[in-house]
């Protein structure tokens, strides 16, 4: 099924230019949205909690910084870019009391709306503008006259102008230079969580760790296992990123390609696919979100325990030692966060 893609010619930039936008949060996405909007002629303020360490950065960049509540009261478009686990509290305490008829509440990710952790009144536009890239890339591409593709969605549209507003916002941060793709809160939320859990974070992490363990337990040096199972992952992913899986197979040796075809399905088999479907079900029916909320309400105890156990793995100690030999790794990391 073909998807619609919208570009600058499809967007009316004057719509968002006629609004007052509050960016709640000044992290990776927040700083990029705010600066790109401002340079597109949009009036922007930053909303931060009292004592936020990001305040100095926002003020240094020339923004007016208000409390979350003050920013929400001032604005008629509020983009909530605080962490997912903080959003419901910020909404209840600071945003909801300051919403007026026709205001728009935008998100960069759909979790809190789709799973009804946040439920604005019926007279509020609920929308999403989600660049498919980290904030530093959104900013850098904008400065270079380009853009990062964006997803947009509208969950609630009392005045039938939400989609035009979301498209205008996406254009103002550079998204329509590359392409803006309409979706739904449900599709964005479920696919994003599934990708993180089954493939990008959870799946990849366990694959790397298990491969490392198999080699070390077979008597091979941890350093060799690290190089082969983790370090070279970037080389392979970069090839897939640039041209797809076929490009990766074309670029590696015939030995690697042939071995991959034979052994890949032995690692990721029908049972793995079934368990991935179980993960998808847990996401769709809210099981994961309930556990996420319980973790937050419990003071992040489960998260901290899991983090500590993973950070103590031998692969972390081996990697720290080997990365000290790689001067280019630290240089690349600094460039990505600049």
UniProtKB/Swiss-Prot annotation:
It catalyses: (2R)-2,3-dihydroxy-3-methylbutanoate + NADP(+) = (2S)-2-acetolactate + NADPH + H(+); (2R,3R)-2,3-dihydroxy-3-methylpentanoate + NADP(+) = (S)-2-ethyl-2-hydroxy-3-oxobutanoate + NADPH + H(+). InterPro entries: 6-PGluconate_DH-like_C_sf (IPR008927), KARI (IPR013023), KARI_C (IPR000506), KARI_N (IPR013116), KARI_prok (IPR014359), NAD(P)-bd_dom_sf (IPR036291). Pathway: Amino-acid biosynthesis; L-isoleucine biosynthesis; L-isoleucine from 2-oxobutanoate: step 2/4; Amino-acid biosynthesis; L-valine biosynthesis; L-valine from pyruvate: step 2/4. The keyword Amino-acid biosynthesis applies. Substrate binds at residue 253. Keywords: Amino-acid biosynthesis, Branched-chain amino acid biosynthesis, Magnesium, Metal-binding, NADP, Oxidoreductase. Pfam families: KARI_C (PF01450), KARI_N (PF07991). The keyword Hydrolase does not apply. Residues 184-329 form the KARI C-terminal knotted domain. It comes from the Bacteria. Residues 3-183 form the KARI N-terminal Rossmann domain. Its cofactor is Mg(2+). Belongs to the ketol-acid reductoisomerase family. Involved in the biosynthesis of branched-chain amino acids (BCAA). Catalyzes an alkyl-migration followed by a ketol-acid reduction of (S)-2-acetolactate (S2AL) to yield (R)-2,3-dihydroxy-isovalerate. In the isomerase reaction, S2AL is rearranged via a Mg-dependent methyl migration to produce 3-hydroxy-3-methyl-2-ketobutyrate (HMKB). In the reductase reaction, this 2-ketoacid undergoes a metal-dependent reduction by NADPH to yield (R)-2,3-dihydroxy-isovalerate. This is Ketol-acid reductoisomerase (NADP(+)). It comes from Corynebacterium jeikeium (strain K411). The lineage of its organism: Bacteria, Bacillati, Actinomycetota, Actinomycetes, Mycobacteriales.
